[in-house]
Amino acid sequence: MEEIRVNRLPAITWRYLHVNDSPDQFEFPGSSASAVFSDKRYVSEGGTLPADFCGASAETLAAAEKGQAYTVIIPENTEAELTISITAEEDRPDFAGCFIFKLEKDAKLNLIWRLSGDRRHSAFATASFYELMENAALSVSYLETGLPASSLYEQRYAVLGNEAKLDFVSAELGGEKVIVHSYGRLAGSWSEMRETALYAAAGRQSLDLFYHIDHIGKESNAVIDVKGALSDTAKKIFRGTLDFKRGCSGSVGDEGDYAIQLSPETKNISLPLLLCTEDDVSGNHASSAGQLDMNTIYFLMTRGFSLEDARLIVVEALIRPLIDRLDESVREEVLAEVRRKLDTKEK
């Protein structure tokens, strides 16, 4: 095990704030579980990540690259659906691997990720590269559940061509230490990328979330939307960046991070960042964190709800629009897991 630094800000601030990056006790994953594909028609083994894939750190990226590599190519004018399941097992508790996705012109893919397992002290390190050619469309639903006392390193990089669209929705509900590093490059004009994440962190869970989208093509559009709840002694840090590069005139970007702290022992840090070298653009950022409004809780309790039920209603009202963006096949599972994790009557 070694100490590394992960998720470094693209434009650093004062060192005494201790938010430019995060320290992490990192251990390379061991015996690897298998990735199971629901459909192997477009899947082949092997592949190489691009040289400019950074990842959360050099160490975490190297760990993913030491595992198995897979390449998924969706041909031109093809619509496909694919589910990738990775389950920690007793004899193979860890996972390391790389995934390269290429959607050719006018291709469409509905992709579902499932990471799960009851095995304690697992370590997952993944690196995924998504390349979307002209007018390609990719919808991703990413679900993590279970994996108690485990470390999860999710790293991804997306490059979008003209009029390409990427909608990435993740439910960060598993693991004890979750590190997400997502970088998007809107290289094509009229390209669109939406990064949505919901979470329900409980116990000693720690979330380190990094999202960065570069606007390069003209009239590109980006959204970063993160919402969730923290209970017990959970903590979360959000680093979100929208970078408007010279030449991306007419582009629009919005980012927001919203956290409900159900306990005074929780900790939340939010760093929404806007960078710009182009005049004709629109960029907005926002963050909100705090405990529940007791007037709202009182109102719900006067209508017959218990304190626990009232708290869950407020949290669900915040994250339900994000859940509805997930693939329909996983929505009820996500909602049930959120309720289970935040139900204080079970603790």
Language-model features, listed with the residues they occupy:
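Conserved beta-strand/loop scaffold segments within soluble protein domains that form the structured core
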Residues: 55-298, 302-305, 327-347
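Extended amphipathic alpha-helical segments enriched in small hydrophobics
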Residues: 297-320
